[in-house]
Amino acid sequence: MKRKTSERSQNEIHVRKPSNQETIAERKEIQLQDRYKDFAKNLGHDIATIEIEIPGSGIILKPDLVDFTSMEIIEVKSGVTRKYVREAIGQVLDYAFQIKQIENKVYNPVILVPGELSKDLSDLLKELDIKVIYENRNTFLR
């Protein structure tokens, strides 16, 4: 596990050209990540990003945030729909598993989203023992 300084977004949008079609992707996820990072740091938390190199594979995983104070690995998503949550589940569980295998440390999986989840999705995450942090006005709730 290699600790990295998390990037701050300087742009509100960036342009990508998948399949020869120009699209504009808003950087809502990075903005949410930056707001949460500032919030957590104001509470005295040591929060950063890391790189996880999977031994023998050449694959490097890059979780969005790690809170070293609360031992949480955090996947940030810009939406609250099932699609976003399902993707986040796979990512955050993989990160937590890899850290446990490589470092023999247990980091609790957390998903950070821009708003409250539906009861169904909240129940799913509870069943999987994945915590949720969501933004509500100018604060973050669990």
Mark where each language-model region is.
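Acidic-basic catalytic patches of nuclease active cores, encompassing PD-(D/E)XK
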Residues: T5-I52
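Conserved catalytic cores of phosphodiester-cleaving nucleases, focusing on short active-site segments
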Residues: Y36, L65-S78
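An acidic intrinsically disordered interaction segment
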Residues: D46-T69, K126-L128
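Nucleic-acid nuclease catalytic cores
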Residues: S78, F97-V132
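Active-site-adjacent loop/helix micro-motif of nuclease/hydrolase catalytic cores
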Residues: T81-Q91, D120
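Short, well-ordered amphipathic alpha-helices
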Residues: G90-Q98
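Charged, structured surface patches that assemble and position nucleic-acid processing machinery
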Residues: D129-L141
